[in-house]
């Protein structure tokens, strides 16, 4: 229940800090709705390479990149507001359970959004303003850094608080992030 409360609090805070035009003006509202539907579908696709065992979270990188891309496009508040229905549509409706959807939102939506926003702010502060820097820095570098930092943090949390009987494939985990 604490997961759900924290998720709802973050979502309501994101809605409060989001400009209302994103959800009321027709071109932007359609883009937000399309992002919600597309990400909810894309997050339920789990691509695997030949020879990979299914269920190893190799498709999890789409979740991280989706959150990072929304942060670069709209900013963190709008990204978190869009990702909340995505997490609950994509996880709760398909797999069921408020706890799973809330944990998914917090770990796979909020963390990459946070790291991506911090990376974008650092790029804006320390690197000169240029179109190439905008595209490469905000798009690729922020996404890459947020994926690596989020994946590493989740791996550390899994090692600290996870079940000790489960074997963790470190190479598979880190290669799955890249």
Regions flagged by a language model, labelled:
Residues 24-35, 59, 66, 79-85, ...:
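Cytoplasmic-side transmembrane-helix entry/capping segments in multi-pass membrane proteins
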Residues 1-6, 104-109, 143, 172-178:
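Alpha-helical transmembrane segments of polytopic membrane proteins
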Residues 1-70:
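Hydrophobic transmembrane alpha-helices
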Residues 47-55, 87-116:
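Interfacial aromatic-anchored transmembrane helix boundaries in multi-pass membrane proteins
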